[in-house]
Design a protein with these regions (language model features):
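Acidic, metal-coordinating catalytic segment for phosphate/diphosphate chemistry
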Residues: 18
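Intrinsically disordered, low-complexity regulatory regions enriched in serine/threonine/proline
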Residues: 1-13, 25-29, 33-129
Length: 129
C-alpha cells in the first residue's frame, strides 16, 4: 500500500465518522474539511517520505481558518485569522498507517484529538455565526 492509497482509506473512515457534521475528505488535498459561513475547519495530512509498503508515517494538523482563506499568506496567521493550528508531530505524536492494525490505531488517535480539539472549538465558533 502506498501513501495515497492509505490516506484514501483513512480519509474515507474519517468521513464516515464525521460526515454527519458536514466533513468531507478531499483526496486531492488530503484534507478532511467542513465549511461554515465564516470558517473552514480541517484536518490536513501529509507525509515526509521514506515510506515503505509496511510503514507510512503521517503528519496530522488540526486547523481552523477564517473565510475567505488566504492561501498565499498575505495575511499573517494569528488568533483572529487562524483560531486553531495544532500539529500532532510537533507534540511528539507520531502516526503510521502502513497496515490495517496501524491504520486502526491512527484512526482512533486522530478521532481522539478531533473530539478534544477541533469539534469543541468548531461548536464554539459556529454558535457565534
Amino acid at each position: 500500500m502506498n501513501f495515497s492509497e492509505a490516506m484514501q482509506m483513512l480519509g474515507t473512515k474519517l468521513q464516515g465518522k464525521y460526515g454527519h457534521l458536514g466533513f468531507k475528505y478531499k483526496k486531492s488535498d488530503k484534507t478532511l474539511t467542513r465549511h461554515s459561513k465564516n470558517f473552514t475547519y480541517m484536518i490536513a495530512f501529509s507525509s515526509f517520505g521514506g515510506n515503505t509498503k509496511d510503514s507510512i508515517s503521517i503528519e496530522v494538523c488540526y486547523i481552523i481558518n477564517t473565510r475567505p482563506y488566504d492561501p498565499y499568506g498575505y495575511a499573517k496567521p494569528d488568533i483572529n485569522t487562524q483560531p486553531l493550528f495544532y500539529s500532532l508531530r510537533d507534540n511528539e505524536i507520531y502516526l503510521d498507517i502502513g497496515n490495517e492494525e496501524k491504520m486502526d490505531n491512527a484512526f482512533e488517535i486522530v478521532c481522539q484529538w478531533m473530539d478534544k480539539l477541533l469539534i469543541p472549538k468548531m461548536n464554539e465558533l459556529c454558535a457565534t455565526e
